[in-house]
Amino acid sequence: MSNKKDVAVKISGGKKIREAREKVKSDTLYNLTNAVERLKSASYVKFDPTLEIVMKLGIDSRHSDQMVRGVVNLPAGTGKTVRVAVICKEEREEEAKSAGADLVGSTNIIDEIKAGKINFDVCIATPDMMAAIGSVARILGPKGLMPNPKLGTVTLDIKNAIKNAKSGQVEYRAEKAGIIHAGLGKLSFSDQDLLKNLNAFIEAVIKAKPAGLKGSYLKAMYLSSTMGASVQIDLTSIA
């Protein structure tokens, strides 16, 4: 049976949620600046939530020529600690370690992946290791961890790849319904830093518009915070 203290906590929590929801109007379109301000004022959780973006694109991702995918280097970073694994030959392991990689190796890492031990957020590989990594493609692929030259994670420039991954590089990929979702920093960031990240991400997605696409590309955009409110963005305010 709940005691009076538990009941008081539940009432207090419910009140905070109601007050937060009242600060955001579901039938209103916001520009990016106002959206960030509203989400901050409406946040009620005790942890530092992530600012999340959802973009609805007018594409059919079932067609190979309408795939939208890429990476963005966020100017203000993500606010997260990123664990980077580098799979390379022995002669380049020291270089990877010096550049800040958290996990460095070759077939030993591949064996760990096969055993289900995946304790990294980004996997970088040199081209000469890709044949061996192919044996774990079905494991890494669905998790979004498979090294890819288009994303800069299959490269000879190990140092720069590690730097990008650590400094706030975010991958985006349109899902079947043309939806792109990404976290773009912590709500504790300054408004200016969040807007820098938002503008960099939106610009990258817009530039990735398929050349042969007919009709409108950007259909809708929403911003939200973890366990918080969601606001719709006025697309006419996007430069």
Curated annotation (Swiss-Prot):
PROSITE patterns: RIBOSOMAL_L1 (PS01199). Keywords: Repressor, Ribonucleoprotein, Ribosomal protein, RNA-binding, rRNA-binding, Translation regulation, tRNA-binding. One of its GO terms (biological process) is translation. GO terms for cellular component: large ribosomal subunit. The keyword tRNA-binding applies. CDD domains: Ribosomal_L1 (cd00403). Coiled coil: none annotated. InterPro entries: Ribosom_uL1_bac-type, Ribosomal_uL1, Ribosomal_uL1-like, Ribosomal_uL1/biogenesis, Ribosomal_uL1_3-a/b-sand, Ribosomal_uL1_CS. One of its GO terms (molecular function) is tRNA binding. HAMAP family: Ribosomal_uL1_B. Part of the 50S ribosomal subunit. Belongs to the universal ribosomal protein uL1 family. Binds directly to 23S rRNA. The L1 stalk is quite mobile in the ribosome, and is involved in E site tRNA release. This is Large ribosomal subunit protein uL1. The gene is rplA.
